[in-house]
């Protein structure tokens, strides 16, 4: 029984660590997801060239809370004038890392442990950005993957499919 309990706890820890919620709570997002720029080749709004967009841009009012999408440890905190601006990277273990960029405020520090749903910062417009949003990336074993597959929380299958379609249709990122 002890071995079974140990395996169950380990599986529970793994599931809590894998990114599985959106970085911006559902009640703070525009529900119709009209302003969502997805993963893939996009027109860069500043440089005006087609470029790979390795994340999803979630728009919300400046100052809106950004949450950790899984348990993990903060491995990088940056404050740059260009690029991702104020950003946080979390290592979730199991090969997963997530990046949250263009923040107004960062509320965590490097080395800090965080839990899924914990506020790590606020929506901003820092770095190379054209408006307030959270640029969110998921990396698996060092390679960017489409974050849309890790954003199903709180959505019906129809709402999830609509979000996927909107993200794929957008041809310009916000960063």
Please state what every model-predicted region is:
Residues 27-174:
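Catalytic cores of peptidoglycan-degrading enzymes
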């Amino acid at each position: 029984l002890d071995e079974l309990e140990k395996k169950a706890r380990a599986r529970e820890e793994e599931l809590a660590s894998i990114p599985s919620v959106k970085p911006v709570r559902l009640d703070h997002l525009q529900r119709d997801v009209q302003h969502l720029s997805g993963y893939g080749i996009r027109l860069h709004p500043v440089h005006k060239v087609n470029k790979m967009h390795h994340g999803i841009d979630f728009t919300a009012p400046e100052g809106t809370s950004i949450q950790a999408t899984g348990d993990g440890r903060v491995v990088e905190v940056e404050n740059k004038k260009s690029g991702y601006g104020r950003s946080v990277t979390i290592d979730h273990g199991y090969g997963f890392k997530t990046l949250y960029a263009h923040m107004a405020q960062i509320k965590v520090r490097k080395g800090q442990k965080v839990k899924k749903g914990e506020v790590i910062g606020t929506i901003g417009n820092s770095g190379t950005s054209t408006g307030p949003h959270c640029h969110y990336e998921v990396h698996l074993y060092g390679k960017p993957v489409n974050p849309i597959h890790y954003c199903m929380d709180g959505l019906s299958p129809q709402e999830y499919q609509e979000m996927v379609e909107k993200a794929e249709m957008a041809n310009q990122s916000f960063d």
